[in-house]
Amino acid sequence: MQSIFGTDGIRGRFNEELTYSLAYKVGYALGSTLKKKSPILIGRDTRISGDILLQAITQGINESGKKFINLGICPTPAIPFLIKKENLSSGIMISASHNPPEYNGIKIFDHNGQKITRYFENKIQKLIEETNQNISVPTKVIPLNTNKNLMDIYIKSLVQAMDGENLSGLKIILDTCYGSATTCAKEIFQSLGADVRVINNSKNGSKINMNCGSTNLAPLKKALKESPADMGFSFDEDADRVIGIDSKGNVLDGDHILFLWGRELMEQKILTNNLLISTQMANLGFEKAWKKIGGVLYRTDVGDKYVHEAIKEKRAVLGGEQSGHILSKINNFSGDGILTALQISKYCKKKNINLNDWLKSSFEPFPQKLTNIKLNFNINKLSLKAKILIDKTIENFQALYSHNCRVYIRPSGTEPLIRVLVEAKSHKKVNSLSSEITNKLSLEINKIIN
């Protein structure tokens, strides 16, 4: 059986790669594998398939003899935070993050609130393979009670992380992407005194990630133009990422957030070895500017779990991805978009500086272009020989073009895509090289497959 786990848990189109039967087996296998007797915490995003997958997983957990707590619709970071806070055995988040509405996923966290290891994934996979029965989908979804008290504990922790600072006097616009941030983002910012306007704020699972959120900033930019504010924040669907926009429409991505937040920690002398952890996607302009002020940037493979591993290994206190996935010591290194947005707002208020001026003090990014090569096949389902040939081809392309620019090529871990990042000193060079590389690489990959 092909591994059901990708780079970030289990992910796929509902009723195709991710079925009711598979979700049931995941719940059963997880419950059967855990030694700790305390309940398993479960949350989900607003996707339409979330309810039926929740029922499947909880049915499997019940069959294993374990108990569960249903948190309902919630931000992904609430799950790892509450696992550790409440001493729970494990946790599951039903979400496909930035993927389209027809996708869903299952992220599993251990008793420490960390994503499970490859070893643990293999144990679950083995048990699933041994569970041969095909589970039929029930005709009716049974509503499950949700635990609102735990959600209140998570919300309180975000407010406490403000260290007594309020946001009075700040006008802020939030794009909650029809997703998990709709549950609490507006209320948290308002409770701290901010004047808040929210867009895309209904729990509409059919609209998530569709022309909104952290991967499409046009609605937030439009809202800031129509109704001027000090800043805006756009969350991804499960609220573990965030991208900011200043009053002039300039983008504050994960690289800028790391630089500005990191510089604050450096000045407070609490940034271990002046070290930040990021990935191969981090902008070269960010790296050069960070080194110029005495900082060290350590790059990992793409994915928050690789950032987390490096943070642990290097004993860093801050890391993240350009996509807005920021991991800090504040909340046990779980990416939390709402927490990140609050911290940026806090520093602006505390320093009495508008985000536009603060952003100007960071760095000028190098022109960068990310292009997706769409595939009509799943790389993970190819033969080992074909996968090796594709990996070698990617390696050769990166080496061939490295003298002209910075090139980073990787297959997506969640979609049938190959992502090509090209970075150079001019937009013209980036565009021409990006076009050349993607066209030639597409031809080479088609030769391998055909």
Curated annotation (Swiss-Prot):
Encoding gene, per UniProt annotation: glmM
Record protein name field: Phosphoglucosamine mutase
EC class name: isomerase
Keywords assigned by UniProt, alphabetized: Isomerase, Magnesium, Metal-binding, Phosphoprotein
Post-translational modification as stated in the protein's UniProt record: Activated by phosphorylation.
Any one of the GO CC terms: cytosol
Catalyzed reactions per annotation: alpha-D-glucosamine 1-phosphate = D-glucosamine 6-phosphate
Residue positions binding Mg(2+): S97, D236, D238, D240
CDD domains: GlmM
Family: Belongs to the phosphohexose mutase family.
Cofactor(s) annotated in UniProt: Mg(2+)
GO molecular function: magnesium ion binding; phosphoglucosamine mutase activity; phosphomannomutase activity
Tagged with keyword Metal-binding: yes
Cofactor: binding comment: Binds 1 Mg(2+) ion per subunit.
PANTHER family documented for this protein: PHOSPHOGLUCOMUTASE (ALPHA-D-GLUCOSE-1,6-BISPHOSPHATE-DEPENDENT), PHOSPHOHEXOSE MUTASE
Domain of life: Bacteria
Residues the record marks as active site: S97
GO terms (BP aspect): carbohydrate metabolic process; peptidoglycan biosynthetic process; UDP-N-acetylglucosamine biosynthetic process
Phosphoprotein found in the keyword field: yes
Enzyme Commission number: 5.4.2.10
Residue numbers bearing the Phosphoserine modification: S97
